[in-house]
Amino acid sequence: MLAQEVQQVLAAGTDDASACQISNMTAYEMEKGRKIVGLTKGATESFVVPRLSPLNSTGGEQWAFDGVSEDGVKSFMFGFYRDPNYSILGAGNFRLSLEFGFANRERVAELYYAERTVIETCPQGVRGVWYSESEGWHHSFLIKADMSEAVITLNSDSLKGTITYKSKSLPIAADGHVWPNGNATTEPVRYLHWSEPIPAGTVEFDVEIKGKKATWKGIGGHERFWTAFSWFTCLTNLQGLRAMAGPYVLSFFRFESGLDEGHVHQSAVLFKDGVQIFRSTLGAESDTEDYVLAQKTYGGAVTGDLKDKVTGFQVELVSPSKKQHYTFFIEHKNLAFEYLLGEGVGGSGFSAIAKGGHVGQLQYEGPSLTEALTFPKNSPLFKSNYV
C-alpha cells in the first residue's frame, strides 16, 4: 500500500499525472551480467533525477544532504544510495546512512537498508522515498524543480521530523558552471559524476532523535554523485567544503582520480547575494586567469582519529583581471562523522566556522562543513570493479 501512496504524492499536485515519471525499484533489482546500462551526463537535465537506469553490478548513485548549525557545533550528514557496491555492508542495494552530531560531541549514526525505493519526477519537483514495509519505516526527500528548496522527512521508530532547505546559491556542475549549461561537465574524474543542486542555503532542523527533540537553524547543502564504477575504482581521495558567511556562499571540491594517476580536478565557486561572482578550476597562481589556492590547516583544537590531523582549511580565490581577492579561513568546531577504512585513512567530516570576505573589505563569519575521504591502498573490502 505504501508504494502506491508515495507514487501518488506529486502526481496529485499536477493537472496531468502522465507528466510524471516513476522509478520504482526493489532492493536486488538490476541487470544481470555485463550489460551496458544508461548513464546520463552533463548539466542540461536536472541534477536530482535518477541518472542510472537500470542499475547494474558496477555503477551506483547517491543523493547526499548535510547541514551545520549556526554555532558550528551541531550537524547532520545523510546519504540516500542506489548502489550495489554497498551491498557488501548490508542487505541490498539501497543503503541509507543518517548521521547526527551534537554540541556535547556525541554522535548518532543509523543505517537502513530499504526494500524498495520510489523516485517520482514531476513538473514541480522530484520526490524520493526509501522504505521498508516489513520494518515499518520510510525516509524521503522532496526537491523543487528549480532546486531552490528541499525537504527531508524522517519517519521511523527512532527518527521523526523534517529538515527544510532554502538555497542561497544556484545549482552548479563539477566545473562550477551554473545549471543548466550545455558546455558544463559533471565528470571531475573519469566515470564519476558530481554536482551540487544546492551549494549552500539556510536549513531548519526539527527532528526527534531517539525520543529527544532537536531543533536548530543553520546552513546546509545537497550533492549528487553517480558513477559507472565504484568510488574506490574512480577515486583515491576527495576534499570538500561549503560555507555561508554574510552575503557569501563558498563551495570548494577536489577530486583525485583512481584510474588516471596524477589527474586532479578541483573547483571553487563563490556566490554573493545569490549571484555567482567567482568560478575557477585552476589550482595554481596565474597573472591572467582566475585561480583558487586551497590548503589544509593544522594546530587547531578539533581533529579526528585518522592519521591526517587536519583542523581546518584556508581558501584563496583570486581574479587578476577583475583585481579581486577573497580569503576564507575555516576552523573545525566539532566532528560530524568519521569512519576508518584501514591504514590510518578513511572518511571524516567536521562542522566548522568560516571567516572571510574580500581582502581589505568587511569580513564575515558563518557556519561551514568540511569533508574528506581517502581510500587505503590495500584492503580486502575495496577492490577495483573496472571492466
UniProtKB/Swiss-Prot annotation:
Its EC number is 5.5.1.-. It comes from the Eukaryota. Pfam families: DA_C, DA_N. Pathway: Secondary metabolite biosynthesis. It is an enzyme of class 5 (isomerase). Induction: Expressed exclusively during fungal penetration of host leaves, the time point at which plant defense reactions are triggered. InterPro entries: DA_C. Signal peptide: none annotated. One of its GO terms (molecular function) is isomerase activity. Keywords: Isomerase. Diels-Alderase; part of the gene cluster that mediates the biosynthesis of a tyrosine-derived cytochalasan acting as a fungal signal recognized by resistant rice plants and leads to avirulence in Pi33 resistant rice cultivars. The first step in the pathway is catalyzed by the hybrid PKS-NRPS ACE1, assisted by the enoyl reductase RAP1, that are responsible for fusion of the tyrosine precursor and the polyketide backbone. Belongs to the Diels-Alderase family. This is Diels-Alderase ORF3. It comes from Pyricularia oryzae (strain 70-15 / ATCC MYA-4617 / FGSC 8958) (Rice blast fungus). The gene is ORF3.
